[in-house]
Amino acid sequence: MAFELVDLDRQGTRMKIIFVRHGEPDYSMLDKLENPQLYSGFGRDLAPLTGKGSSLAKEVAKTACFGKAEIIISSSVTRALETAHYIAVETGLDLFVEPFFHEWRPDLDGTNSDLTSVLVAHEYYLKHQGGLSEDSPYRYETDLEMRHRFLRALEKYKNYKTIIIVTHGMLMRQFVPDEKIDFCQVIECEIEI
């Protein structure tokens, strides 16, 4: 596991964030349904961790730097919440659920609910470096919108100096330089809000 310290130039209250990407999700139970399309989009967020994902989350819960944290805040998505639960059990820290710490939204209009459409939206997102081009067939969440959503939600926790946030890779990449973030990877950074 890689641990990095990232200093971002933001004004205001300084906060140390210990980001944790969620464990490996298990979509198989949703994919095996008679009508798996009923669980497309946010429906896929109901999937729990795989056995491997649970084991890795239990292992990462023992990470030494967690001892410096005051609270744990988790995305409300099942895979993040299950990961955060293991950390809370191990550390004894209070766990808060933050619905606005969710993953990147590939569909802001409710028009691209199938996997192919999501992949096309992601392709445009990457091609335009997190921006939204006029020729995009879908309106997805941009990097700027993701950062704004996260920072606005983070405001209510500004009285804490060190927090653990269990969330998703694309959201974490808005604040850390890592291009690839593994399941249960821990990355420390400082943010001013």
Predicted feature locations:
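Acidic, low-complexity terminal tails and accessory targeting/binding regions
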Residues: 2-17, 35, 60-63, 96-118, ...
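Active-site-proximal alpha-helix that buttresses catalytic centers in soluble enzyme cores
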Residues: 3, 8-97
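Generic beta-sheet signal
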Residues: 17, 70, 159-169
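Cofactor-binding loop segments of dinucleotide-utilizing enzymes, especially the Rossmann-like FAD-
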Residues: 22, 100, 168
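Short, active-site-adjacent cap segments at secondary-structure transitions
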Residues: 26, 80-81, 104, 171-173
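Phosphate-handling substructures
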Residues: 26-30, 34-48, 90-149
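Conserved glycosyltransferase catalytic-site signature
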Residues: 77, 81, 151, 169
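A short, acidic, amphipathic alpha-helical segment used as a generic capping/interface helix at domain edges
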Residues: 146-158
